């Protein structure tokens, strides 16, 4: 689920972490897991300012993910 913050979108997750490829789908950046995998393997995704090529990278609360000119911040729900 995306929410708007002053500077970037906030994406809420209901678990401690989410894998990078799953996050791209959850945030509606990609239409499928295959598409997510290709963008990640091509070095088109940054996590906390660093290019990330591991699709299974665990993304935790507070991480910032950049893709295609957009930034999102992950927020783990406490509910």
Language model regions located:
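Short acidic DE-rich linear segments
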Residues: 1-3, 78-79
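A basic, amphipathic helix-loop patch mediating RNA/tRNA/ribosome contacts
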Residues: 19-61
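Generic N-terminal leader/processing signal
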Residues: 1-2, 17, 23, 35, ...
């Amino acid at each position: 689920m995306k929410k708007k913050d002053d500077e970037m979108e906030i994406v809420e997750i209901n678990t401690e972490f989410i894998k990078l490829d799953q996050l791209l789908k959850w945030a509606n950046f990609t239409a499928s897991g295959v598409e997510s995998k290709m963008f990640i393997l091509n070095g088109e995704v940054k996590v906390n300012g660093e290019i990330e090529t591991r699709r299974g990278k665990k993304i935790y609360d507070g991480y910032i993910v950049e893709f295609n000119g957009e930034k999102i911040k992950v927020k783990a729900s406490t509910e």
